[in-house]
C-alpha cells in the first residue's frame, strides 16, 4: 500500500484529506490482514485436530486406496460460454491448475461437479489442493476429488497437504487420475469422519465467510483509492474504525 499512498497527488489536496485517505486505506488493509490471520489460525486448528484424532495413531487405521473412497474426475476444456467475471448468467466458478486466487479461472452457467470435495493440481504446481463447495467446473486436467463420506473432503484435504506428489513419468509432468486413485492412505470409518466433520465444518464455514469479506474489502479498497484521488467521494474516517 505504500506505493498506492505515494501515488496520491498530494499537492492537489489538503493535508487533512490526505490524512483521512491514509487512515481509511490503512483501516481496510488492517481488516484484510486480520481476516487472513484468523483464517491461518483456523486452518492450523483443523490441522491440529487431524493430527490428534487420526495421524497420531495412523498405523491403527485401515488402509484404503483413494480411488475406492472417492470419485476422481479430470477437468476438460473450458466451457464455450463463460465469463472472466461473475455475471447474471454465469454464476458457476471455473477452476484450473493455477494457484492465483485459488485457481479461479472464471464463471460459467452449469456445474459439472455437484458435491463438495477437493481439487488437486495435475500440472504446474502438482499437488496444490483446495477444498471446494459443490457446484463448480474443473478444467485443463485439474483433478476433482469427491469423497464418498461426509467429512471425507476435510480429511483428504489434510492428507493431500501432507503428500509429496510424484508425476506420472511423462515428458510433460502431470498427475493423472490413475496415479492419484492408486495412492493408499490410512482412512477412518464413516461415523468417525462424520464426527470430524461436526468439528471442522463450522471452522471451514468461518474461513469461507472471512474470504468473502476479504474479497469485498479488497474490492472496496481498490475502488475507493481512485475515487478519493479524484475527489469524487467524500471522506468518512469512521470506515476505518468499524
Regions found by a protein language model. Give the residues of each.
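DNA target-recognition domains and sequence-specific DNA-contacting regions of bacterial/archaeal
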Residues: 1-12, 64-188, 239-242
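Non-catalytic DNA-recognition/assembly elements of restriction-modification systems
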Residues: 2, 7-100, 186-236
Amino acid at each position: 500500500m505504500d506505493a498506492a499512498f505515494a501515488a496520491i497527488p498530494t499537492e492537489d489536496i489538503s493535508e487533512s484529506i490526505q490524512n483521512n485517505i491514509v487512515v481509511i486505506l490503512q483501516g481496510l488493509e488492517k481488516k484484510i490482514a486480520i481476516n487472513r490471520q484468523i483464517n491461518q489460525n483456523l486452518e492450523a486448528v483443523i490441522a491440529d485436530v487431524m493430527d490428534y484424532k487420526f495421524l497420531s495413531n495412523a498405523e491403527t487405521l485401515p488402509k484404503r486406496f483413494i480411488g475406492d473412497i472417492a470419485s476422481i474426475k479430470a477437468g476438460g476444456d473450458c466451457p464455450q460460454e463463460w465469463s472472466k467475471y461473475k455475471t447474471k448468467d454465469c454464476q458457476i466458478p471455473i477452476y484450473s491448475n493455477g494457484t492465483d486466487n485459488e485457481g479461479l479461472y472464471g464463471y460459467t452457467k452449469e456445474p459439472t461437479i455437484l458435491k463438495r470435495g477437493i481439487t488437486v493440481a495435475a500440472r504446474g504446481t502438482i499437488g496444490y489442493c483446495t477444498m471446494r463447495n459443490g457446484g463448480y467446473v474443473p478444467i485443463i486436467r485439474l483433478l476433482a476429488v469427491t469423497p464418498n463420506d461426509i467429512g471425507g473432503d476435510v480429511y483428504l484435504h489434510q492428507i493431500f497437504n501432507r503428500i509429496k506428489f510424484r508425476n506420472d513419468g511423462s515428458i510433460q509432468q502431470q498427475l493423472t487420475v490413475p496415479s492419484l486413485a492408486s495412492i493408499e492412505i490410512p482412512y477412518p470409518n464413516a461415523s468417525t469422519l462424520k464426527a470430524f466433520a461436526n468439528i471442522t465444518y463450522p471452522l471451514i464455514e468461518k474461513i469461507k465467510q472471512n474470504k468473502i469479506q476479504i474479497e469485498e474489502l479488497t474490492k472496496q479498497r481498490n475502488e475507493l483509492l481512485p475515487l478519493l484521488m479524484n475527489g469524487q467521494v467524500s471522506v468518512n474516517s469512521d470506515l476505518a474504525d468499524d
